[in-house]
Amino acid sequence: MRSRKSSRAEAPGLPTDRQLGLSWDVPGLLAGVDEAGRGPLAGPVVAAAVILDDVQPIRGLGDSKVLSERVRERLFDEIRAKALCCCIAEASVEEIDTLNILQATLLAMRRAVAGLRLRPNKVLVDGNRLPVLQVPAEAIVKGDAKVAAISAASILAKVHRDRLCLALHEAHPQYGFAGHKGYPTPDHLAALRVHGACGAHRRSFAPVREVLLERRP
């Protein structure tokens, strides 16, 4: 087995695993976890888990929300090719409406970690809430801008969900999902009032619920 050295996968400005008190010199692996799609009115919430390979650096990692779509798409392919392992998971619209968005997000995170081919000995999660996991975990606020593995997870989750929204647009072009990605923009809210909700809309979210009530006979 090849020896592990301190991680070189972080982009300039991101702290190394050793600076975070984590080291490849001890047995085990570090996974980063992040989500995409908590705020939209439609579609699943997506989570990703990534274990990076310190001998295959990925340059340019950062918060997916501040990267251009072109850069995210390029990094998506590079992360999938170079990571030791990764997993993208979802919680459905039905699960969101049944559990609430927070619990559905934590469920998607659990599924992403459980789907990793390798078992991490620690999981770092973006934000301030942790899913229940079988391994030690730590929540890191703004972790997608601080930790390379979380940044990689945020990119995988964001790109995957954006692609789902393109598919939703093909099925329901009247809502404009390709543009707003399900977020409550004025155009999306106007389309909801005109066309009502489709099967991809989250009925538990107030703007959708209000439209459904308005359209009751």
Swiss-Prot record:
It is an enzyme of class 3 (hydrolase). Its main location: cytoplasm. One of its GO terms (molecular function) is RNA binding. It comes from the Bacteria. InterPro entries: RNase_HII, RNase_HII/HIII, RNase_HII/HIII_dom, RNaseH-like_sf, RNaseH_sf. Residues 28-217 form the RNase H type-2 domain. Its EC number is 3.1.26.4. GO terms for cellular component: cytoplasm; ribonuclease H2 complex. One of its GO terms (biological process) is DNA replication, removal of RNA primer. Keywords: Cytoplasm, Endonuclease, Hydrolase, Manganese, Metal-binding, Nuclease. It is found in: Cytoplasm. SUPFAM superfamilies: Ribonuclease H-like. Manganese or magnesium. Binds 1 divalent metal ion per monomer in the absence of substrate. May bind a second metal ion after substrate binding. Coiled coil: none annotated. It catalyses: Endonucleolytic cleavage to 5'-phosphomonoester. Its cofactor is Mn(2+); Mg(2+). A divalent metal cation binds at residues 34-35, 126. Pfam families: RNase_HII (PF01351). Endonuclease that specifically degrades the RNA of RNA-DNA hybrids. Belongs to the RNase HII family. This is Ribonuclease HII 2. The gene is rnhB2.
